[in-house]
Amino acid sequence: MAVGVICLMGMLTACGRTSEQKVTEIRVAFNQNENHPQYRAMKAFGEKFEKETNGRYHVTIYPNGVLGEQGAMAEFIRTGALQMAIVPCSVPEGYDADFAIVGAPYLYDNIDHLEKATLNGVFDDLFASTEKYKFRVLTVYTAGERNVYAKKPINSADDLKGMIIRVNDSPTYVEMAKLMGGNGSVMAQ
């Protein structure tokens, strides 16, 4: 399973707005386009959040990686230039190696298992531990299953021997490719 995280800077309080109160902008960024479920989810979140806070907050969405690659988005959160980002687990893994477990290969049997494992509080302490890096992981999401695409059929790990396998910028994924007999090549995020 491909698993990612949603990071947030600061704490937001949903309370009413008076006419004198300033609207607070929440900037959220990710690398997917406007047709992707991440965009639709953030658009729905923004509309609901704005309504529930009586317009005190407004969510501005930056899709398509327009604010930079995913590692940069975490840095923008840390500096306050961005309030939310949707990134793969490899981004917080760059700050805390314990995040490798969240997106570890073959950890989950299926989507239901992933949801059961990630939405029941098991990772709450890990998510909260990122506050020392000036961001907080709010939740995880699934991006489907990881696949290997090749010009030849891949039926077993033997078929991967010597192949260059594109992976996220994660020591876990590079090592996974190596253990399967291939060579992990980090791709841009």
Model-assigned labels for residue ranges:
Residues M1-E25:
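Short, low-complexity disordered leader/linker segments with a strong preference
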Residues A44, K48-E52, H58-A85, N110:
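Extracytoplasmic small-molecule ligand-binding "clamshell" domains
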Residues E47, Q83, P88-M187:
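Contiguous mixed-secondary-structure segments that line small-molecule binding/active-site clefts
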